[in-house]
A protein has these predicted regions:
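Hydrophobic/aromatic residues within well-ordered alpha-helical segments
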Residues: 26, 69, 76, 80, ...
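Hydrophobic alpha-helical connector segments
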Residues: 75, 89-118, 169-176, 198, ...
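N-terminal intrinsically disordered/low-complexity leader segments
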Residues: 1-25, 32, 213-215
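Helix-loop "lid/cap" segments that line or gate small-molecule binding pockets
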Residues: 91, 107-114, 124-129, 204-208
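Amphipathic alpha-helical packing segments from all-alpha helical-bundle domains
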Residues: 82-89, 115, 133-160, 170-174
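Helix-turn-helix
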Residues: 29, 37-71, 75
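Hydrophobic/aromatic-rich alpha-helical bundle segments in the mid-to-C-terminal region
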Residues: 120-125, 136, 140, 158-204, ...
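Short hydrophobic clusters on alpha-helical segments that form packing/core surfaces
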Residues: 30-38, 109, 205
């Protein structure tokens, strides 16, 4: 057997494992490989062949698991938004006050960003592609539901005297949301553990930066 033929056999054997690996495991492998590629190269810059090579399957075999490249993108984003929604619902169901709800929403937002770094990058960096291929509306629809968790807690906190009433709930919500999601690009973010960074952000939003305010 020649070396070249042996390499071809090994490659064929490696990629044929998609026939023996369970479907859930194979789908997860494809999703993981695709997410990293999309985040690094952009969705438009990633080909089906790229995904197949990264996942260790023939590109034609991908269609047994996903109808298209965009179907993979849609599932990655759906997983991201579904995780956020589930975590927010749990916080809302278990927290004892609006302050604790907001504290929990801050913590869980940062948790999701850490658990889904590639999907987060896709959502932030590929919005034009997502919009052009009708992939953005499902995400925006889910975002509107998530937004209500924030606004309901902020309004309730203001009514109960826990939060200021001279700052519109929408302004506070957008400030917190945009700041949290932008932290993926902060070079000093990695200096803190998730718990430390969550507490730092909570302190900043709740207590501000001034030690003494001039009246």
């Amino acid at each position: 057997m020649t070396p070249g033929y042996r390499r071809d056999c090994v490659r064929q054997q490696t990629r044929s494992d998609d026939l023996t690996t369970t479907t859930p495991d194979r789908r997860a492998q494809i999703l993981d490989s695709s997410a990293e590629l999309f985040a690094r190269k952009g969705v438009a810059g990633t080909t089906v062949r790229d995904i197949g090579e990264a996942a260790g399957v023939f590109s034609g075999s991908l269609y047994h698991y996903f109808k298209s490249k965009n179907a993979i993108v849609a599932e990655l984003l759906a997983d991201l938004m579904g995780d956020i929604a589930a975590r927010f619902e749990l916080i809302e169901a278990t927290a004892s006050s609006p302050v604790e709800i907001i504290r929990g929403l801050i913590r869980e937002t940062l948790t999701v960003i850490e658990l889904h770094p590639y999907a987060t990058a896709i959502y932030q960096n590929d919005r034009n592609y997502l919009r052009a291929h009708e992939l953005l509306e499902p995400v925006d629809r889910a975002s509107r539901g998530i937004r209500e968790h924030w606004l309901e807690a902020i309004r309730r906190g203001a009514e109960e005297g826990a939060f200021r009433v001279d700052i519109a709930p929408e302004i506070f919500y957008r400030t917190v949301r945009d700041t949290l999601w932008s932290t993926t690009h902060w070079p000093d973010r990695k200096q803190y553990t998730l718990a430390e960074f969550s507490e730092l952000m909570t302190t900043l939003f709740f207590s501000g930066f001034c030690l003494v305010l001039d009246e």
